[in-house]
C-alpha cells in the first residue's frame, strides 16, 4: 500500500508515461484514490482501469518494458481470468521521487457473474465499458473514474452526488451485488460507520 503523496506521484508518473502514446485517455484512476481526492483526503494508493480488452495486462507489460523493469512471469504479475495485472514500481524514479515499494494494479473494465453462490470467484467475465464496470463495484463512491491524462471525472452511477450527500449505496441492484459477494456487505457497513454516513438499501 502506498503512503500519501506517493499515490499522487504515481498518477503523475502514469500521466507522463502515456502522453502521446496509444494509452493516452485510456487509463482511469478508480476507487479509493478518486473517492479520497474528492473528499479532500490524501489518497493512499492508486488502482487503474484501462479501457481496452485485456487493457490491464497489456498496459502493465507495456509500462514495465518502457521503464525497464519487465520480468516475464513476475513483473507484472498477471491474473488472466480477470484481465488484471499488478506491477511493482521498484527502481522507477519520477520527478526526483523514488517510486520503489509502490505497486500499481490495473484492470480492464469488466462485468462479472457469480453462478455459484458459495464462491467469491466470478464465473463469467466480460469486457465492458466504464458504465458496466461501475455497476459491478461495491459502492457508487468507489465507482468514480478519473482520466489520468486529462483529470476529467467520469461518474456513471452518481458517486459524486452520494459523496456530497454522505450516502453509501450500491451502484446497481443490491441483491445482485451482495448475493455475488457477501464480503462486500461487510465493507459497505464498514464504510458507512467509518464516515458516519447514511446507508441506503
For each feature predicted by the language model, list its residue ranges:
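Catalytic cores of the polymerase beta-like nucleotidyltransferase superfamily
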Residues: 1-201
Amino acid at each position: 500500500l502506498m503512503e500519501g503523496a506517493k499515490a499522487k506521484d504515481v498518477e503523475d508518473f502514469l500521466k507522463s508515461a502515456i502522453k502521446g502514446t496509444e494509452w493516452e485517455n485510456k487509463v482511469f484512476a478508480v476507487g479509493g484514490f478518486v473517492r479520497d481526492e474528492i473528499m479532500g483526503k490524501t489518497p493512499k494508493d492508486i488502482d487503474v482501469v484501462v479501457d481496452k480488452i485485456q487493457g490491464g495486462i497489456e498496459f502493465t507489460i507495456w509500462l514495465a518494458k518502457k521503464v525497464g523493469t519487465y520480468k516475464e512471469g513476475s513483473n507484472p504479475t498477471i491474473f488472466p481470468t480477470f484481465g488484471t495485472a499488478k506491477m511493482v514500481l521498484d527502481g522507477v524514479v519520477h520527478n526526483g521521487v523514488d517510486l520503489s515499494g509502490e505497486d500499481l494494479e490495473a484492470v480492464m473494465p469488466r462485468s462479472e457473474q457469480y453462478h455459484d453462490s458459495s464462491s467469491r470467484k466470478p464465473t463469467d467475465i466480460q469486457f465492458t465499458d466504464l458504465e458496466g464496470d461501475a455497476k459491478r463495484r461495491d459502492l457508487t463512491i468507489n465507482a468514480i473514474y478519473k482520466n489520468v491524462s486529462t483529470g476529467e471525472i467520469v461518474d456513471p452511477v452518481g458517486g459524486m452526488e452520494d459523496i456530497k450527500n454522505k450516502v453509501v449505496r450500491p451502484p446497481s441492484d443490491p441483491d445482485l451485488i451482495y448475493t455475488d459477494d457477501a464480503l462486500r456487505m461487510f465493507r459497505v457497513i464498514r464504510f458507512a460507520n467509518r464516515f458516519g454516513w447514511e446507508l441506503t438499501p
